[in-house]
Amino acid sequence: MFEKSTWIKLPRNVVLGHDVLDDVPAVVEDVHLRGAPLVVTSPTPDEVAAQRIVASFAERGVEATKVVIEEATFAAVQRVMDRAEAADPGLIVGVGGGKVIDVAKVAGDELGLGFVSVPTAASHDGIVSGRASVPEGDTRHSVAADPPLAVVGDTGVIADAPWELTTAGCADIISNATAVKDWQLAHRLKGVTYSEYAGALSEMTAEMLVDRASDIHPGLEESAWLVVKALVSSGVAMSIA
């Protein structure tokens, strides 16, 4: 008797490319999120992206609340939640690198609010996936949370991010090749559930990025495009695993 079931949650909209940052309010409207946004960011992403997003909402007559965090901690998550309880937003928009995205994702999940991911760097596949990494002391916790309802990645902003963040994103993708092998071994030796679809997608994404390695250079939007699309694919693989 077949009794297997799964519930796969994926972003509804993924908007990537040149000068798409101003499209955030339209993307929010398209996924039917209502109410004013709480924009979660950190100091540098605030200057390069979040202020512009807040202004875009203001042009539509929507007053966004903004909270600037310094690091990804459970204390930062609580601070975002406290600000949300005071502001009563309809959604959370995370604008920044992996740390900001993770904090906003966990806070949105805890509050039951829709979350929109706006990465300013292509540093890891958490910009799309349903997991967040939050450190506590010497321990880094991997926390399950709903994936973003939408992702908006401006390749101009991402291309201008520090190069080491982009290379970290590349390493995150390429490491999937060995991660899948470990997963397959655990399946054979320990009976760990293995998803052929997720494994195949992860391996394909890693192989495609390696094949295009010569096209990835600092400061190029085309390079940011390649890496971000690969991170999206990797994040989707995590969600269907």
What would you call each of these model-derived segments?
Residues M1-L91:
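ATP/NTP phosphate-donor binding region
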Residues R12, E110-E207:
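A glycine/threonine-rich phosphate-anchoring loop and its flanking beta-alpha core
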Residues H18-D19, T41-P43, V95-G97, V118-A121, ...:
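Fold-independent oxyanion-binding glycine-rich loops
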Residues D23-V27, R52, R79, V106, ...:
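Alpha-helical scaffold segments in soluble metabolic enzymes
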Residues V28, H32, F57, I174-D182, ...:
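Structural signal for hydrophobic packing residues in well-ordered secondary-structure cores
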Residues A49-Q51, V103-K105, I127-V128, P162:
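Short glycine-/acidic-enriched loop or helix-start segments at secondary-structure transitions
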Residues A84-A122:
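A short, small-residue-rich loop immediately preceding and capping a beta-strand
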Residues S195-A241:
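Active-site segments that bind and position negatively charged phosphate/pyrophosphate groups
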